């Protein structure tokens, strides 16, 4: 068994390994532990430090690495194992993480009271102001199992400095949960046995948005905004001019929902934003939409100082690019970030081999369902 090619996936922690042999049983399995009855090569791969799990189907493996591990160290060991070669360890400087920070809030009956940020190498926690904790305590009823009822709610992935992101998330939660909302959540918690907070959506006009003087009120408006249409673009463009990055980021999220080519200039604004989280969100939207008109903008994004943005741009060029993009790709072929470099190499290889640009996974699914 040999490796035919290695392909990045939409997840930085997963690589697709295409093999020379196809499974004969047409089954699929996920392997996480070394077990006697498993194929030897699977156990050999699981024995590699940094390999978390393996999904095996047809003629490929999807290998997940531990978040703290680095592909530049793990991938050569995978290659040598599958190709039955001896691996000679050489010193590599571990690649920095993508700047990704996982944000979570500890919730009790819909009331947040603690923030947790996690990177590949660090974790930081911060308690919300006392009135959040007091609200959480007021929401408790006799007989409540607090340990069972409290949950970590995923707030998505953020990008940047840990301290800056913590301050940003802290501000956001305070903005989204004013005292009157906390009081309402407490009342609901005390009046019902099981609390499943439902997202309430409310459409606002441009004038209503502009009349709000507090950015926290504006953020709540955007968070509670229903699926927008092109008729809402003036409001969303207004939000793109705000000083607060959370407002600009949420505006990009909403703009991406419109799914019309007319929104491209607004997503380009997001792609040039000074905040990396806004730029990455715009890149995600452009990737999901898959409009080839965005290719020049994504070529420019290969110069972004944040490697998570460059990686998204390289992924888009792999999904949508053609011969016209080869000069840009080749000029960035030595990107210092290993994952970005690998994605660029894959894009160059696909284009030079004349393989069809299939688009993102979401685009392929959408086309299949048409």
UniProtKB/Swiss-Prot annotation:
GO terms for molecular function: oxidoreductase activity. SUPFAM superfamilies: ARM repeat, Hypothetical protein SAV1430. Gene3D superfamilies: Leucine-rich Repeat Variant, Scaffold protein Nfu/NifU, N-terminal domain. Belongs to the CvfC family. This is Conserved virulence factor C. It comes from Staphylococcus haemolyticus (strain JCSC1435). The gene is cvfC.
């Amino acid at each position: 068994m040999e490796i035919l090619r290695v392909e990045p996936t939409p997840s930085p922690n997963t690589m697709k390994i295409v093999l020379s042999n196809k499974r004969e049983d047409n089954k699929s399995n996920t392997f996480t532990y070394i077990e006697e009855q498993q194929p030897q090569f699977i156990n050999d791969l699981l024995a590699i430090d940094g390999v978390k799990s393996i999904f095996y189907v047809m003629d490929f493996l999807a290998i997940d690495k531990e978040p703290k591990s680095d592909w530049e160290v793990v991938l050569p060991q995978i290659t040598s194992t599958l190709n039955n070669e001896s691996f000679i360890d050489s010193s590599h400087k571990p690649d920095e993480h993508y700047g990704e920070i996982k944000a979570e809030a500890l919730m009790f009956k819909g009331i947040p009271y603690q923030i947790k940020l996690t990177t590949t190498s660090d974790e930081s926690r911060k308690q919300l102001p006392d009135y959040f904790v007091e609200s959480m305590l007021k929401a408790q009823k006799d007989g409540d199992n607090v340990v069972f009822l409290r949950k970590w709610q995923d707030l998505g992935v953020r990008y940047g400095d840990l301290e800056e992101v913590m301050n940003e998330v802290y501000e956001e939660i305070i903005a989204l949960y004013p005292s009157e909302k906390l009081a309402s959540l407490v009342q609901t918690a005390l009046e019902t046995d099981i609390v499943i907070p439902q997202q309430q959506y409310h459409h606002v006009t441009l004038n209503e948005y502009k009349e709000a003087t507090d950015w926290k009120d504006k953020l709540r408006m955007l968070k509670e905004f229903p699926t927008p249409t092109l008729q809402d673009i003036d409001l969303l463009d207004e939000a793109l001019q705000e000083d607060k990055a959370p407002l600009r980021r949420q505006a990009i999220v909403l703009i991406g929902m419109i799914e019309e080519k007319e929104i491209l200039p607004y997503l380009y604004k997001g792609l040039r934003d000074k905040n990396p989280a806004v730029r990455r969100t715009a890149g995600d939207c452009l990737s999901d939409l898959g409009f080839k008109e965005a290719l020049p903008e994504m070529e420019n994004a290969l110069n972004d100082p944040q490697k998570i943005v460059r990686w998204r741009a390289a992924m888009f060029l792999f999904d949508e690019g053609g011969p016209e993009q080869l000069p840009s790709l080749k000029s960035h072929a030595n990107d210092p970030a290993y994952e970005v470099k690998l994605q660029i190499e894959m894009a160059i290889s696909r284009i030079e081999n004349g393989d069809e640009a299939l688009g993102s996974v979401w685009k392929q699914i959408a086309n299949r369902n048409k």
